[in-house]
UniProtKB/Swiss-Prot annotation:
It comes from Clostridium botulinum (strain Eklund 17B / Type B). This is dCTP deaminase, dUMP-forming. Keywords: Hydrolase, Nucleotide metabolism, Nucleotide-binding. Bifunctional enzyme that catalyzes both the deamination of dCTP to dUTP and the hydrolysis of dUTP to dUMP without releasing the toxic dUTP intermediate. GO terms for biological process: dUMP biosynthetic process; dUTP biosynthetic process; nucleobase-containing small molecule interconversion. Its EC number is 3.5.4.30.
Amino acid sequence: MILSGKEILKHIGEDIVIEPFSEERINPNSYNLTLFNELLVYKNETLDMKIPNETEKLIIPEEGLLLEPGKLYLGRTNEFTQTNKYVPMLEGRSSTGRLGLFIHVTAGFGDIGFAGYWTLEIFCVQPIKIYPNTEICQIYYHNIDGEYDLYNSGKYQNNNGIQPSLMYKDFEK
């Protein structure tokens, strides 16, 4: 079952943390998150899962940044989120989707106990200009049935910024 906006609001500061938080961004069953003013792009055209891939930082100026199709941009939310009771899910807003802008390629599913900024896997189907602090995606929360363990992976937990893939660490096990 998905939490309503009113339920999200009720649990803010307790079971759900969203910082900074603005009540104006509550929807009937989600909360709008905003785009930070930095992006990462991979330097090499060919990526390797077994090694750290080099990235380059781009700043999104107030006047906007033009994204190119066929290129992956890693961004992040301005908001730090945490939940110890609900399953967080991230989805692009329909307004961004209707512009051909994808906010996540595969990683829209969060784990109970995740604490950090959401890394966005941004991809566009045609050139599009983006702006910092835009309400770009939404987070919503599911109840979970049964016993569970909190997320405790060290890879992405308590991140401070945009996280490129750390898949290479899986090969070190």
